[in-house]
Amino acid sequence: MKNRSLALSQSILVLHGPNLNLLGVREPQHYGRDTLDDINRRLTQQAKAAGFSLSALQSNAEHILIERIHQCLDDGTAFILINPAAFTHTSVALRDALAAVKVPFIEVHLSNVHAREPFRQHSYFSDLALGVICGLGAHGYELALAHAMRHLSAQA
């Protein structure tokens, strides 16, 4: 990394939408056996090893996710990884919050949404996202984080 002290000042936010607190239990054929704690622990270690700070929030409530996105205007969040889960297909409000704060983000989905029910194939976020990763299970989060850190390092 070019400037480790700059990276340390850069914070990455991971947002997990509804029902992701049930990972490891809910439909493992689609979402895998990793728990949300497993995923967050690996992401925190990956970010720390590269000199970045990372925070994560899971909520089943749309307004809590929106309020956390709004906080990015004041807290120095440099990048967002978001798995909007079911809000992917329904939440214009969450989309508007991401558009308003202008923090780059990657949309992550554990399952391949394009191989599932038709209603899961529409996203209100993809056209705003720097990228979209789906169908790679929990590893998709790690790939998204690696790209976020590379993106932030290139901006330095």
From Swiss-Prot:
Similarity section: Belongs to the type-II 3-dehydroquinase family.
E.C. designation(s): 4.2.1.10
SUBUNIT field: Homododecamer.
Site feature: Transition state stabilizer: R26
HAMAP family listed in its UniProt record: AroQ
GO BP: any one term: aromatic amino acid family biosynthetic process
Listed pathway(s): Metabolic intermediate biosynthesis; chorismate biosynthesis; chorismate from D-erythrose 4-phosphate and phosphoenolpyruvate: step 3/7
Gene encoding the protein: aroQ
Role according to the record: Catalyzes a trans-dehydration via an enolate intermediate.
Chemical reaction(s) catalysed: 3-dehydroquinate = 3-dehydroshikimate + H2O
Keywords (A to Z) from UniProt: Amino-acid biosynthesis, Aromatic amino acid biosynthesis, Lyase
Record Gene3D superfamilies: Dehydroquinase, class II
The name this protein goes by in its record: 3-dehydroquinate dehydratase
Keyword check for Transcription regulation: no
Source organism (scientific name): Chromobacterium violaceum (strain ATCC 12472 / DSM 30191 / JCM 1249 / CCUG 213 / NBRC 12614 / NCIMB 9131 / NCTC 9757 / MK)
